UniProtKB/Swiss-Prot annotation:
Family according to the record: Belongs to the class I-like SAM-binding methyltransferase superfamily. Cation-independent O-methyltransferase family. COMT subfamily.
Enzymatic reactions: 7,9,10-trihydroxy-3-(2-oxopropyl)-1H-benzo[g]isochromen-1-one + S-adenosyl-L-methionine = 9,10-dihydroxy-7-methoxy-3-(2-oxopropyl)-1H-benzo[g]isochromen-1-one + S-adenosyl-L-homocysteine + H(+)
Residue positions of the active site: 335 (proton acceptor)
Identification of the protein by name: O-methyltransferase VdtC
Keywords: Methyltransferase, S-adenosyl-L-methionine, Transferase
Enzyme type, top EC level: transferase
Organism: Byssochlamys spectabilis (Paecilomyces variotii)
UniProt: S-adenosyl-L-methionine binding residues: 284
Amino acid sequence: MAEEIKLTPLETFAQAISASAKTIATYCRDSGHPQLSDDNSSGLTGDVLPPSAPQAVTAARQTILEASYRLQQLVTEPSQYLPRLTVYPQHLAALRWLCHFRIPELIPVQGTRTYYELATEAKVPLHQLQSIARMAITGSFLREPEPNIVAHSRTSAHFVENPSLRDWTLFLAEDTAPMAMKLVEATEKWGDTRSKTETAFNLALGTDLAFFKYLSSNPQFTQKFSGYMKNVTASEGTSIKHLVNGFDWASLGNAIVVDVGGSTGHASIALAESFPDLKFIVQDLPMVTSTSKDNREKTPLPETVASRISFESHDFFKPQPVQNADVYLLRMILHDWSFKEAGEILANLVPSVKQGARILIMDTVLPRHGTVPVTEEALLRVRDMTMMETFNSHEREIDEWKDLIQGVHTGLRVQQVIQPAGSSMAIIEVVRG
């Protein structure tokens, strides 16, 4: 009897990609959804896969992302590691330049422009535009269907349809990336500090203020950060749908939800649209609530939710002013702070939390290394690094979350931990017994 030949990792990853590609192609063929194409024949608008795609199809997409990433790692020579790494900062530099000069906005979504036309209208040097755009094209941002003719790719068209992506780009290039590059200097200068004013952020932006105090004092920074928050909230891993669908909100009935540190209210708006019995109070710092007010004046809230959402200024390091609400929501808040300061935020809620009320924490629960796909873990490690660079904090594993919560008040306990499928964050339900 012939000995069974075991597949090598190279063959395993290749087979996984092939099988998953067939799953997606078959689904697109049977459902009428456009086939994925690198020549843009599938169109510029819409998702790669529709939200209604079966779980097996979305899982196939994730398999391709993971297996292709692992396959590239497998076949990349050690000598190619640094040359390949140089691509990423240049992609970011190109994207910043294009967004700063608003080049994507000058190209019709379904049309073309010449480099000369774009350079003339944007008042930028032609040779710079050509070099920078062609760098971006290697990263699937823009296309050059004919020599010296520029058109949108699916990705760059999305920037036109969603202008706040420009703010996110500028926040990433002008603030987040410089912070990452100052981590060495921060360690050399301050060592194992936990201070919020002794961070890579402070060195990169040249400020003595902690992040959120700087945020409240700098409107331009606030605008960029708001664009980042809006889009991070809408991305798959941090999509609001995981908050909306991941918890049994309907069971609360006519409840009041306090959205602590809720920025411009995107989470509360999404919940209000799905659960008409709920009322919301969105709290954040004065500068953020002012920006939120300006945004609502430009784009009013839908009439169906406007009467059920109110906004107020509040510093969550001070006692919670709203007494006896049913839910206090902390979404993407506590990971910004050290163990001590996160405990202070929770402690400021406790006097206002009635018996049987809930504190819902939606945040990253860091997995043990190697227990999730590399592509997923890499993004979680990005968040962990960003917390270090910005706040001298870090993402927590579940045992750390439990220690934090139980250390605040003996009456608080973790009722359940919900991990919505596809979410990079978990919902930790905390009750006061």
